[in-house]
């Protein structure tokens, strides 16, 4: 992995290049280790700027926040947003932000204002994320999110999927929306 990132950085050969690493071992089957981050930051401190951690491992995210200065750590799910912020992380980058953005902003503002409602807001955000996952479980996450966005925006264009995904039938759409609205 070090050779992979090195080759990209060297071939681009531009100090303006900024790389946010994506740690999603369930999909990539290749975890981004702390040792790799350490090596990359030592060799390319101007280019390697942060990571989105979609591993679901809160301790890993918090450890990165603690161990790497001037390195932006983003939680890959709203569930870990507040813990990452508290540990000095940058925030969250999440697939569901089209739907949860308002609540994410509320959590972020409450955190920055040291508001005593931040824990309550984070709990609401985590519940919203869990509800989205439940609603999308029967059709797949991407397709389910498209169905929900279509409903929220009253725009069927959101339901269009590219292969290998296919548009859901009406009964599945109704099921997804029913769960989401519960």
Annotate each PLM feature.
Residues 154-182:
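Flexible C-terminal active-site loop/helix
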Residues 123-127, 150, 181:
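Short amphipathic alpha-helical surface patches that mediate protein-protein
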Residues 85-88, 129-163:
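Conserved short secondary-structure transition element at the edge of the structured enzyme core
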Residues 9-17, 24-129, 133-137:
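Catalytic alpha/beta core domains of metabolic enzymes, predominantly
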Residues 2-3:
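Glycine-rich anion/phosphate-binding loops
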